[in-house]
Amino acid sequence: MEKKKIVVTAGTFDILHPGHYEILKFAKSLGDELIVIVARDETVKKLKGRKPIIPEEQRREMVEALKPVDKAVLGSLKNKLEPILKLKPDIIVLGPDQTTFDEETLKQELAKYNLYPEIVRFRGYKKCPFHSSFDIVKEIIRRFCSKEIKI
């Protein structure tokens, strides 16, 4: 029996949007099983200076419910690499806006643990108006923070 090709990607996934779905479909197309690491609330606060709008467990559940995703797990509070070391993926897909690691640094860090997955940077967002959480929040503010709005 041939070993399943495991693909891992990671992100915050706060306010799911079409861009998230695009990267998940792409990641799944590269292998047999897609496991998504969802960033912890505390980690997001450290990186972005604010907690996510949607709590971590709800974000994990929503991501896991998406068709391309086989499993979603929460990231580690201690070591960003911990879930990857446990999962031992064949491929890691980085999003276009992920800056925690660049491809080379990630390869070097994982090599210290004798892990040598293929690392792929996703660059293929379709041109849709709402492929980022920030764009969605800006549009909500534009639409609902004017005086003419009647709710």
UniProtKB/Swiss-Prot annotation:
<keyword id="KW-0808">Transferase</keyword>
<dbReference type="GO" id="GO:0046444">
    <property type="term" value="P:FMN metabolic process"/>
</dbReference>
<comment type="pathway">
    <text>Cofactor biosynthesis; FAD biosynthesis; FAD from FMN: step 1/1.</text>
</comment>
<dbReference type="InterPro" id="IPR004821">
    <property type="entry name" value="Cyt_trans-like"/>
</dbReference>
<dbReference type="GO" id="GO:0003919">
    <property type="term" value="F:FMN adenylyltransferase activity"/>
</dbReference>
<keyword id="KW-0285">Flavoprotein</keyword>
<keyword id="KW-0547">Nucleotide-binding</keyword>
<keyword id="KW-0548">Nucleotidyltransferase</keyword>
<dbReference type="InterPro" id="IPR050385">
    <property type="entry name" value="Archaeal_FAD_synthase"/>
</dbReference>
<keyword id="KW-0274">FAD</keyword>
<dbReference type="InterPro" id="IPR024902">
    <property type="entry name" value="FAD_synth_RibL"/>
</dbReference>
<comment type="similarity">
    <text>Belongs to the archaeal FAD synthase family.</text>
</comment>
<comment type="subunit">
    <text>Homodimer.</text>
</comment>
<keyword id="KW-0288">FMN</keyword>
<feature type="binding site">
    <location>
        <begin position="12"/>
        <end position="13"/>
    </location>
    <ligand>
        <name>ATP</name>
    </ligand>
</feature>
<protein>
    <recommendedName>
        <fullName>FAD synthase</fullName>
        <ecNumber>2.7.7.2</ecNumber>
    </recommendedName>
</protein>
<feature type="binding site">
    <location>
        <begin position="17"/>
        <end position="20"/>
    </location>
    <ligand>
        <name>ATP</name>
    </ligand>
</feature>
<feature type="binding site">
    <location>
        <position position="125"/>
    </location>
    <ligand>
        <name>ATP</name>
    </ligand>
</feature>
<dbReference type="Pfam" id="PF01467">
    <property type="entry name" value="CTP_transf_like"/>
</dbReference>
<dbReference type="InterPro" id="IPR014729">
    <property type="entry name" value="Rossmann-like_a/b/a_fold"/>
</dbReference>
<dbReference type="GO" id="GO:0006747">
    <property type="term" value="P:FAD biosynthetic process"/>
</dbReference>
<dbReference type="GO" id="GO:0005524">
    <property type="term" value="F:ATP binding"/>
</dbReference>
<comment type="function">
    <text>Catalyzes the transfer of the AMP portion of ATP to flavin mononucleotide (FMN) to produce flavin adenine dinucleotide (FAD) coenzyme.</text>
</comment>
<feature type="binding site">
    <location>
        <position position="97"/>
    </location>
    <ligand>
        <name>ATP</name>
    </ligand>
</feature>
<keyword id="KW-0067">ATP-binding</keyword>
